[in-house]
């Protein structure tokens, strides 16, 4: 089966959040994060969850810098999707090289859907003796299937319980660089 062309999918997709709304939400998140970390003696460890978190993480990092909050960068790559539209078992492709022992860690991801990936990643950070682990996501999907105890500390926008893509989220590995969030047609 061939992968649908993104251009064909976009013709029938709904725009859920325009770029301006996403950037305004990120600015608001940056204010809250700065307030929570401003008094720390050491910059927080800002861990981007690849690949989806990259566009959001870049914009959030700049917004934090504009507010005078320095961060130390690292990344991880753990996925359940691997180019599919539904998840399976978690695969670790890269773990952060920076020691988390005693550190305040900010995990940055594109979306909180059911929470399986974020739960596993958060637990792993805690097992590395992180002092504190918080989660920032661009989007939270609205439904009742989230894993118990999983939530984001900082949320940009809510999205409907549909397949969404753009601004880091992909449709068959396509469309991550779209400047808005779209949903497949019902």
Report residues per predicted region.
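PRPP-associated nucleotide enzymes
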Residues: 1-186
């Amino acid at each position: 089966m061939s992968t649908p062309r993104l251009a064909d999918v976009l013709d029938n997709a709904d725009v859920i959040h325009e770029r301006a709304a996403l950037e305004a939400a990120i600015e608001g998140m940056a204010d809250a994060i700065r307030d929570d970390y401003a008094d720390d003696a050491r910059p927080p460890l800002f861990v981007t969850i690849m690949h989806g978190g990259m566009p959001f993480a870049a914009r959030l990092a700049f917004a934090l810098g504009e507010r005078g909050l320095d961060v130390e960068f690292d990344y991880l790559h753990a996925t359940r999707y691997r180019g599919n539209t539904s998840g399976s078992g978690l695969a670790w492709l890269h773990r952060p090289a920076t020691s988390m022992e005693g550190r305040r860690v900010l995990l940055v991801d594109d979306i909180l859907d059911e929470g399986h990936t974020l739960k596993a990643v958060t637990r792993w950070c805690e097992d590395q003796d992180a002092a504190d682990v918080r989660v920032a996501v661009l989007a939270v999907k609205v439904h009742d299937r989230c894993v118990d105890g999983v939530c984001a500390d900082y949320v940009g926008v809510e999205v409907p319980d549909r397949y969404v893509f753009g601004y880091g989220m992909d449709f068959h590995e396509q469309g991550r660089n779209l400047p808005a969030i779209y949903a497949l047609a019902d």
